[in-house]
Amino acid sequence: MIQSPTSFLIVLVLLWCKLVISCFRECFVALHQLVQVLLQIINSNLQSRLLLWHSLD
C-alpha cells in the first residue's frame, strides 16, 4: 500500500490535519454551548430584574 516514505508522510500529515480539524470542531461546539448557556443566564437575570422593577412601580 505504502511505496515510499514520502507517501507515508503525506498520509500522516493528512491524518494529523483531520485530527486538528475535528478538535477545532469539538472546541467550537463546546464554546457555542457555553455561549448559549451564558445568554440564557443573562436573559433570565434580565427578566427577573424587569419583573422586580415593574413590581416596585
Swiss-Prot record:
Involved in resistance to IFN. Keywords: Host-virus interaction, Inhibition of host innate immune response by virus, Interferon antiviral system evasion, Signal, Viral immunoevasion. This is Non-structural protein 3a. Residues 1-23 form the signal peptide. GO terms for biological process: symbiont-mediated suppression of host innate immune response. Pfam families: IBV_3A. It comes from the Viruses.
